[in-house]
Amino acid sequence: TLAALGGAIYAGPVKKAAEFEAQMSTVKAISNASADDMKRLSEEAKHMGATTKFTAVEAGKALEYMAMAGWKTDQMLGGLPGIMNLAAASGEDLGQVSDIVTDALTAFNMTADQSGRFADVLAQASSNANTNVSMMGATFQKVAPVAGALGYSVEDMSLGIGLMAN
């Protein structure tokens, strides 16, 4: 009936708004961000949801992984575009890509402001080898802590992983 159709039309946006609020509550709980910082993070997630192929909820999930890595608000805001570009280019899940990038940056003693560089290196390596971002991320998970401690660069490791994948 018309009432049921109207309810269904109204329920969709309400559910999405509730999902977004729940996701951002998770970010707040992990990051312990102030109300002002949460406003900035929420606005950026909504902006990314409106201007990229990803939803605001997915952008919030990426922020969650950044918060788990100990990134502060400005680091999250600075790192989000590069991570989103890598996820878009690879066609992979944004949250998973954020997890890969934040974990690898930590292992290589790189800072959040280097996430764009790391994302570019990973995108290039995965597109030039018989691998993808997820497989490279799984490999980085195993080798990055040792490689980083030994002073190897992300570029060296990406090249090595790409060669082994071929």
Regions found by a protein language model. Give the residues of each.
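Small-residue helix-packing and pore-constriction motifs in hydrophobic alpha-helices
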Residues: 2-50, 61-69, 76-90, 96-129, ...
